[in-house]
Amino acid sequence: MKVDLGPDPSLVYRPDVDPEMAKSKGSFRNYTSGPLLDRVFTTYKLMHTHQTVDFVMRKRIQFGSFSYKKMTVMEAVDMLDDLVDESDPDVDFPNSFHAFQTAEGIRKAHPDKDWFHLVGLLHDLGKILALWGEPQWAVVGDTFPVGCRPQASVVFCDSTFQDNPDLQDPRYSTELGMYQPHCGLENVLMSWGHDEYLYQMMKFNKFSLPSEAFYMVRFHSFYPWHTGGDYRQLCSQQDLDMLPWVQEFNKFDLYTKCPDLPEVKSLRPYYQGLIDKYCPGILSW
């Protein structure tokens, strides 16, 4: 049975995106009419109501022991066969194909960076949370720091946070909230979802990938930062140095999706070799 993760915002709903770019992408990913807009808004209303400091801490404890399943990375990729991410309603195919499409796009543009190819394959594996009963608003969608006031480029920022209890707490309702200026994103509590889960899982299992890879995984859905230009007050110099890598990854994450599905069988040996190199064996999930 396929699990629909529910709608993610497209470019046309992100307030920081160039209108011409949004228009061209909107012709392919239609979020401009029908019931989908209401569903997208509902997803973000739930997310922005319930993603609090307390919620994120509880989820980190719940999943932080990585005791749900023992399996290899390729087995996790295969699990994505059962995930159809409705963020792309015009192209109805499993998320596993998106993993290979992203990886192959990176491979063509950066043939000398095999670790980067692997990040393309890995980046959405955290969506297996949906198979463990997590609601869509706690799995997909744009991410943001909890514990401080949401910034202007957070999608639906002005209309979805009214019922979030943290914004009534003076510790969390200012621009910096519970953080120190330029504390570094490594010290920031991000909203819970597939990015944060996989980032923590990679650390737990000691993936031997460069730090750029960990940044790409953890922050590829952090659109208010890498595209909106917000949350710079929390960034360290290292974060700013890593930002171009996250932006480079984002191009392939967004723009490699198409109905021409890759021949996965022929690609598997190459990517299995990368898995064996950087994250081999049976891992804890």
UniProtKB/Swiss-Prot annotation:
Binds 2 iron ions per subunit. Kidney specific. It catalyses: myo-inositol + O2 = D-glucuronate + H2O + H(+). Fe cation 1 binds at residues 98, 123-124, 253. Signal peptide: none annotated. Fe cation 2 binds at residues 124, 194, 220. Keywords: Cytoplasm, Iron, Metal-binding, Oxidoreductase, Phosphoprotein. One of its GO terms (cellular component) is inclusion body. The keyword Cytoplasm applies. The keyword Oxidoreductase applies. Pathway: Polyol metabolism; myo-inositol degradation into D-glucuronate; D-glucuronate from myo-inositol: step 1/1. Substrate binds at residues 29, 85-87, 127, 141-142, 220-221. It is found in: Cytoplasm. GO terms for molecular function: aldo-keto reductase (NADPH) activity; ferric iron binding; inositol oxygenase activity; NADP binding; oxidoreductase activity, acting on NAD(P)H. Its cofactor is Fe cation. Its main location: cytoplasm. The modification Phosphoserine is found at residue 33. One of its GO terms (biological process) is inositol catabolic process. Its EC number is 1.13.99.1. InterPro entries: Aldo/ket_reductase_CS, Inositol_oxygenase. Belongs to the myo-inositol oxygenase family. This is Inositol oxygenase. It comes from Rattus norvegicus. The gene is Miox.
